[in-house]
């Protein structure tokens, strides 16, 4: 009935917006296509790379205290965990031709359910224009930018995110209950 997304792009809006700036932000997607090397390097020193990603890209250091970073590192250090994480990006290329025909059709169908897109306006991985271009593909869309938040908006600004979610769910439930 409703959809809530935090800093996750609609793929058509992502493709439409893709230019040099987004390419530079998405370099890691291409790096992850190399077999075994990314997970090997990311796993060195107890998955220190995972900690560095969160430490260097968040805008509110208190959201990622050392004990939270350690949980991410421990989880990433488990057997097969880094490969699974990186395979998310590798899957973009596998089966693309078979899926492309179906996706192309589906990606042009508008999303018609009430949707809330919460977006940190200082995301280092995704251009803000991707969020604004999502209106082309979602007919009932509310975009809420959180100033000074990064890609990790739900960790950095959880109070604001929770309030936005509560307001959205309450409002859309009220509208759904109104007689037509």
Region locations from a protein language model:
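Flexible "cap/lid" subdomain of the alpha/beta-hydrolase fold that forms the substrate-access gate
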Residues: 1-145, 166, 171-173
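Catalytic active-site module of serine/aspartate enzymes centered on a nucleophile-bearing elbow/loop
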Residues: 140-180
